[in-house]
């Protein structure tokens, strides 16, 4: 559904001290502290019109103020990788969600299949590293 916020789900490769919550979109930290969060998404469009995408972090069900990343694709078949890093202060038991929305059914997150010369690529990635407590 267009113009609707969705949480991305990550179920593999969680680091020590970070686990999946319920639902699986929740990434729960076991220790409080300052965390650097690195996010990337490969976005694509099948429209010749402009398609806009929004991405932002949500902590404990609340959107992080001033954190939205907005990107637009302007042609049919366009693909772009977008990324951002943020530092968040989290308390033990807090959960982080990566949220996204798009304004057209022609826009989508694009996981690329492997080719004869390159490996597959996920549609999105996230890494969460505790800097200090």
Q: Which residues does each PLM region occupy?
A:
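Glycine-rich strand-loop-strand elements at beta-sheet edges
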Residues: 63-91
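Terminal (often C-terminal
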Residues: 1-50, 63, 67-70, 105-133
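Compositionally biased, intrinsically disordered linkers/stalks adjacent to structured regions
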Residues: 88-116
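Extracellular beta-strand-rich recognition modules
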Residues: 33-43, 81-85, 93-101
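Beta-strand signatures of extracellular beta-sandwich domains
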Residues: 54-58, 97
């Amino acid at each position: 559904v267009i113009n609707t916020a969705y949480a991305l789900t990550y179920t593999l490769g969680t680091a020590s001290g970070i686990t999946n919550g319920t639902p699986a979109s929740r990434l729960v930290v076991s220790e409080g502290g300052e965390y650097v969060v690195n996010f990337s998404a490969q976005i694509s469009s099948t429209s010749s019109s402009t398609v806009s995408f929004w991405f932002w972090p949500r902590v404990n069900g609340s959107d992080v103020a001033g954190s939205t990343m907005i990107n637009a694709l302007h042609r049919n078949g366009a693909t772009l990788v977008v990324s951002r890093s943020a530092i968040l202060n989290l308390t033990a038991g807090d959960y982080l969600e990566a949220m996204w929305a798009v304004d057209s059914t022609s826009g989508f997150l694009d996981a690329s299949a492997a080719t004869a010369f390159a490996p597959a690529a996920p549609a999105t990635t996230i890494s969460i590293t505790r800097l200090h407590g």
